[in-house]
């Protein structure tokens, strides 16, 4: 084997490895489910999102709703996107739910962490378990999440009963190298992981 040919192989291998290493990759970190899941199927599951980028929210809501319907669940994109914490936005959030006639809400939020392994501004599941108190926490985290360069996205999707405003299920995911893609292209693998988590916990 000539030295030039060997060098070419090495360079191609390095390029392939670098390409794989920088592709976004979503994994499920954990889930929590109430010991007493509702026996009746969800009549209408409203999808609402909180993140610092609306494009991510649009892609997630539309794709999640389509996939839920494909699995026999009436998932409905709210087409309401939240990035700021003001009293007006909090009122709009509550109004979006009240006007939807949904019996359950899937509330998803995306936060970003620094390139280091620390989890700056990541909210633990259980920090807030009420539907509207969780919104308060999510928005405060989402706003600070865009203040620095990122490499990893930590996201949580939680389902709440509108009656009683209690959380019945939650999942946390982590997407490495999320900064190399867009919301539209990030959403499919994130949605797929959430769906598998819902199946695992017998929500689908």
Locate the predicted segments by residue.
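N-terminal segment of the mature soluble domain
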Residues: 42-118, 170
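Short low-complexity stretches enriched in small and charged residues
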Residues: 30-35, 59-73, 124-129, 198-204
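Short, low-complexity, polar/charged sequence segments that are solvent-exposed and flexible
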Residues: 64-69, 95-96, 124-129, 176-179, ...
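Sec-dependent bacterial lipoprotein signal peptides
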Residues: 1-20
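C-terminal/domain-edge helix-coil "capping" segments
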Residues: 20-43, 52, 138-204
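Short, flexible, glycine/charge-rich loop motifs used to bind or transfer phosphoryl groups or to couple energy/partner
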Residues: 10, 35-37, 95-96
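Surface-exposed short loop/turn segments
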Residues: 89-159
């Amino acid at each position: 084997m000539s030295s030039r040919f060997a060098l070419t192989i090495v360079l191609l291998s390095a390029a392939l490895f670098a390409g794989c290493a920088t592709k976004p990759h979503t994994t499920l970190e954990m889930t929590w489910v109430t010991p007493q899941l509702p026996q009746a199927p969800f009549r209408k599951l409203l999808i609402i999102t909180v993140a610092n980028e609306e494009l991510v929210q649009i892609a997630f809501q539309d794709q999640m709703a389509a996939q839920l319907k494909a699995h026999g669940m009436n998932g409905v994109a709210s087409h309401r996107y939240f990035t700021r914490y003001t009293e007006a936005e909090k009122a709009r959030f509550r109004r979006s739910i009240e006007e939807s006639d949904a019996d359950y809400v899937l509330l998803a939020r995306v936060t970003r962490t620094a390139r280091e392994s620390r989890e700056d501004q990541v909210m633990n599941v259980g920090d807030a378990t009420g539907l509207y108190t969780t919104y308060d926490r999510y928005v405060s985290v989402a706003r600070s999440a865009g203040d620095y360069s990122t490499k990893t996205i930590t996201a949580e999707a939680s389902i709440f009963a509108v009656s009683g405003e209690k959380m019945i299920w939650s999942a946390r995911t982590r997407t490495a190298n999320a900064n190399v893609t867009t919301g539209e292209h990030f959403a499919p693998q994130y949605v797929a992981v959430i769906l598998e988590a819902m199946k695992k916990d017998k929500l689908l």
